[in-house]
C-alpha cells in the first residue's frame, strides 16, 4: 500500500547546505589560502593590493559581501552536518538536541558573518 501522506523530511535542506559547503571548501578555500596566506606574505602579490581600503571596498561590494559570507558560512554548515552525522556514527545518539545544537551553531556563524560584513 502506498502512503498518501508521507512524513516530510528536513534532511534535503541540510544536505544541500552540506554539499554547498563542501564544494566551496574544496574549490575556493585553497585558492583563498594561497593568495592571502602565501602569495601576499611572500611578496609575490603586491601588499598594496591587500590594503585596508581595497579589502574594505571589496567586502562592502555586493559580490565581495557574498563571497565573504559564503566563505565563512558554507564550510560551517558542512562541518556541523558532518559533526552531527559523525556523532551518530560513533553511537552518540544526541537526537533532536544534537541536531539543534549543530545547526544552531552553523546558523549563528552565518548570522554573525552577515552582521560583521554589514558593520564594515
Curated annotation (Swiss-Prot):
Q: Does the keyword Cytoplasm apply?
A: no
Q: Which GO terms describe its molecular function?
A: succinate dehydrogenase activity
- Provide a GO biological process annotation: fumarate metabolic process
Q: Spell out the InterPro entries in the cross-references.
A: Fumarate_red_D, SQR/QFR_C/D
GO CC field: fumarate reductase complex; plasma membrane
Q: How does it sit in the membrane?
A: Multi-pass membrane protein
| Keywords in alphabetical order | Cell inner membrane, Cell membrane, Membrane, Transmembrane, Transmembrane helix
**What superkingdom heads the lineage?**
Bacteria
| Principal location listed in the UniProt entry | membrane
Entries under SUPFAM superfamilies matching the protein: Fumarate reductase respiratory complex transmembrane subunits
Q: Which family does it belong to?
A: Belongs to the FrdD family.
NCBIfam families the record matches: PRK05470.1-1 (NF003977)
Q: What does this protein do?
A: Anchors the catalytic components of the fumarate reductase complex to the cell membrane, binds quinones.
How does the annotation summarize its subunit structure?
Part of an enzyme complex containing four subunits: a flavoprotein (FrdA), an iron-sulfur protein (FrdB), and two hydrophobic anchor proteins (FrdC and FrdD).
The protein in question is named Fumarate reductase subunit D
Per the UniProt record, the source organism is Photobacterium profundum (strain SS9)
Upper classification of the organism? Bacteria, Pseudomonadati, Pseudomonadota, Gammaproteobacteria, Vibrionales
**Gene assigned in the entry:** frdD
Amino acid at each position: 500500500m502506498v502512503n498518501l501522506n508521507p512524513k516530510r523530511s528536513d534532511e534535503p535542506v541540510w544536505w544541500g547546505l552540506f554539499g554547498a559547503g563542501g564544494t566551496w571548501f574544496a574549490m575556493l578555500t585553497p585558492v583563498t589560502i594561497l593568495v592571502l596566506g602565501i602569495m601576499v606574505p611572500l611578496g609575490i602579490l603586491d601588499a598594496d593590493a591587500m590594503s585596508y581600503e581595497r579589502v574594505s571596498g571589496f567586502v562592502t561590494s555586493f559580490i565581495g559581501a557574498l563571497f565573504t559570507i559564503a566563505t565563512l558560512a558554507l564550510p560551517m554548515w558542512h562541518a556541523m552536518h558532518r559533526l552531527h552525522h559523525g556523532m551518530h556514527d560513533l553511537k552518540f545518539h544526541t537526537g533532536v538536541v544534537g541536531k539543534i545544537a549543530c545547526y544552531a551553531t552553523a546558523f549563528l556563524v552565518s548570522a554573525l558573518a552577515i552582521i560583521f560584513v554589514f558593520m564594515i
